C-alpha cells in the first residue's frame, strides 16, 4: 500500500453500484455475497485492469446507507415513511449519507500505509452533492471529481426534478455554488457539467480570493467529441 501514488474513493449511488457490480462480478461475485445477479461487463473490467497495470492507483468504493447491499425494500409508502423518520431525528437521508462518506474517508486514513497517501473522491449526481459537503468537514482530500451534480437544493425552480436531495435548513445559509466555493478552499475541485454558467458564482468568488486554480469546469465525460 505504501507504493500507491493515490487512492480514489468512489461514492456510489444505485447507478454506480450497478456499474461496479457488473464490472467486477465475474471475478469477485463469489467473494461478495451481496453482489446482485447482474451480467458481467468484461470490457469494463479489462479497462479497469489496464488502469491498475499502468498507474499506481488504488480504488476504494463506498455505498452510503440505503444503496447497494443496504438498500431498503418495501412499498413506495414504506419508503416514504422511512424517509420521514430522518426528519423526526432532525436529519435527512442525504444528511446522514454525508456522515457515511466522512467515516469512509476516516476509515481509509486508518489503514496502515494509507495515512499520508493522496486521496481523491469521485461521485455522481446526488452522491456528488453529499461528497462535496463531506469534503468541507474532512482534511487531507487532494481532489474532488464531481459528475452531473445538481446546482441547487431549491425544489421550486423550473426544473424541480433536477434539484439536489434535501438537507435541512441548508438554504437559510447557502446553496451548492457557495458550498463548492467553501470546499475549494481546501481541495482541488473538478466539476463535470454541461451548464458551466451555473457555477459562475463559484468561479468568480474563487477568482476574487486568488484561488481560481482550485476550480476546474469540464465537459461531462464522453461528450468531448459530440457536437
Predicted regions and their residues:
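C-terminal catalytic histidine-bearing segment of alpha/beta-hydrolase fold enzymes
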Residues: 171, 197-227
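A short helix->loop->beta-strand "cap" motif at the edges of active sites that frequently abuts
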Residues: 185-189, 211-212
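Short, conserved active-site loop motifs that form the nucleotide-linked donor/cofactor pocket
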Residues: 57, 119, 142, 212-218
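Cap/lid segment of the alpha/beta-hydrolase catalytic domain
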Residues: 4-111, 115-118, 151-161
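The conserved SAM/SAH-binding core of class I Rossmann-like methyltransferase domains
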Residues: 62, 147, 192
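Conserved strand-to-loop "acid loop" that flanks and positions the catalytic carboxylate
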Residues: 188-196
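Primarily recognizes the serine-hydrolase "nucleophile elbow" in alpha/beta-hydrolase
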Residues: 104-174, 179-182
Amino acid at each position: 500500500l505504501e507504493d500507491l501514488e493515490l487512492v480514489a474513493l468512489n461514492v456510489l449511488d444505485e447507478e454506480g453500484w450497478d456499474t461496479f457490480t457488473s464490472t467486477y462480478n465475474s471475478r469477485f461475485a463469489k467473494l461478495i455475497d451481496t453482489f446482485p445477479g447482474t451480467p458481467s461487463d468484461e470490457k469494463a473490467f479489462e479497462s479497469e485492469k489496464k488502469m491498475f497495470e499502468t498507474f499506481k492507483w488504488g480504488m476504494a468504493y463506498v455505498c452510503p446507507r440505503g444503496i447497494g447491499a443496504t438498500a431498503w425494500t418495501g412499498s413506495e409508502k414504506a419508503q416514504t415513511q422511512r424517509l420521514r423518520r430522518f426528519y423526526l431525528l432532525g436529519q435527512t437521508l442525504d444528511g446522514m449519507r454525508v456522515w457515511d462518506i466522512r467515516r469512509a474517508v476516516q476509515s481509509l486514513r486508518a489503514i496502515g500505509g494509507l495515512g499520508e497517501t493522496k486521496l481523491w473522491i469521485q461521485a455522481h449526481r446526488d452522491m456528488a452533492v453529499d461528497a462535496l459537503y463531506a469534503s468541507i468537514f474532512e482534511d487531507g482530500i487532494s481532489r474532488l471529481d464531481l459528475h452531473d451534480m445538481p446546482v441547487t437544493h431549491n425544489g421550486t425552480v423550473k426544473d424541480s426534478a433536477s434539484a439536489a436531495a434535501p438537507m435541512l435548513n441548508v438554504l437559510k445559509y447557502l446553496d451548492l455554488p457557495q458550498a463548492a466555493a467553501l470546499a475549494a478552499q481546501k481541495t482541488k475541485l473538478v466539476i463535470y457539467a454541461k451548464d458551466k454558467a451555473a457555477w459562475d458564482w463559484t468561479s468568480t468568488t474563487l477568482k476574487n480570493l486568488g484561488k481560481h486554480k482550485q476550480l476546474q469546469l469540464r465537459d461531462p465525460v464522453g461528450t468531448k467529441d459530440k457536437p
